[in-house]
Amino acid sequence: MRKGEVVDEKGAPLRADSPCRIGGYIFYYRELEQETPIPFEERVLYRDDHILAVDKPHFLPVMPSGRFLRETLLVRLKKKFGFEHLVPIHRIDRETAGVVIFSHNPDSRGDYASLFQKREVSKVYEALAPTLPDGRFPMTYRSCLAEGEPFFRMKEVDSEPNSETRIDVIENRRDTTLYRLTPVTGRKHQIRVHLAALKIPIINDRLYPDLQRRGADDFSLPLKLLARAISFPDPLTGQDRCFQSGREL
């Protein structure tokens, strides 16, 4: 703890007298004998005195977890910029590429975090998946998502919908379609589950519709899901912010 290697789920260092929160998570930086290098680089899209907007590559986790420590977006950025108080304001899956916003100023962190709590943030994703036969677009898909088996997967259950995704077509390709997806809600794996439920699972998805056997990452087969853009009104200046990934699927 003296080295700041024990942190909460937002990456903030914890002390021995730090209060515990029910349902909270505690992480610690540990040494790994072997950690597979992720052969892709992040790109900084924007930086000011309060936030960083970063274009994350596929396969790179946002936070340290499991078999990943140094090869995470948070640790890479801390080493690059030396920000002691760097914290992601939101996250995307390790398998997903695209825009992630970080706070590096504790004084303004709450202002930016509150945008997500108030649902004042708009996100746009893109996904490459099979073409939906006779699909009529744009369309809206709703369902109730709950924790599945194993615990890291989600499933649809017969209950009042708690998730909603707006889906449209960007372009049709030879055997696939590039979709634009706007999540109205932010449930875990929401887009992946919704497209799988429509019988058009995202290309190279190893979790949906069926859990595939875990093995070493095949860096030539990334999940074809991209957090293309994120936009919000800046809580300090009132200026409209929009950050877009430069990656392609």
Describe the residue ranges of each PLM region:
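RNA pseudouridine synthases
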Residues: 1-249
